[in-house]
Amino acid sequence: MKLKTVSTFVGAMFCVVPAFASPEITEEEAKQRHCLAEAILFEAGNQPFVGKLAVGEVIMNRVKSNKYPNSICGVVHQGPINKWWKRVHNKIVPVRNKCQFSYYCDGRSDRTNKWARTKTWQDVLNATIYLSVLHNISVTNGATHYHANYVNPAWNKYLRKTVQIQDHVFYK
């Protein structure tokens, strides 16, 4: 399916999401959605809506797989933790640059509040709702991995490329 077709389809399908979205969610569901929104923002904030959706879909595909943690936050935060911080300060701090999702352990502040009134944040929230409610439509053909198109990670030779959406290349 071509990207333009996917974008049109996703746009049309998204129009129905608010009708299906539950106004009441549990605290745990809210936490998981926040992890998803944060990951989409920091991994794909500069991408078009379909690119944000694709990154979120990779996370959701990992949650469904038995090869990864079974929660959104578990998938997003997967990686080794700094044992010194855990032992001395009783804090879970990721080892820098060793995470599955680079924003989580790049040493930069990951505050979402400065994005609160932007179109980017609204797109992220829309993608999060879409993925939480209508998660049976794929724009990545089942991808569980992706990378920016300006890098060439060693792991990509072991996977099959499914699609490229703007600056991200997706694999399964």
Locate the predicted segments by residue:
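Bacterial N-terminal signal peptides that target proteins for export
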Residues: 1-7
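Gram-negative bacterial Sec-dependent N-terminal signal peptides
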Residues: 9-14
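N-terminal signal peptide c-region/cleavage motif recognized by signal peptidases
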Residues: 16-18
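Bacterial extracytoplasmic/cell-wall-associated proteins, especially those involved in peptidoglycan
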Residues: 20-172
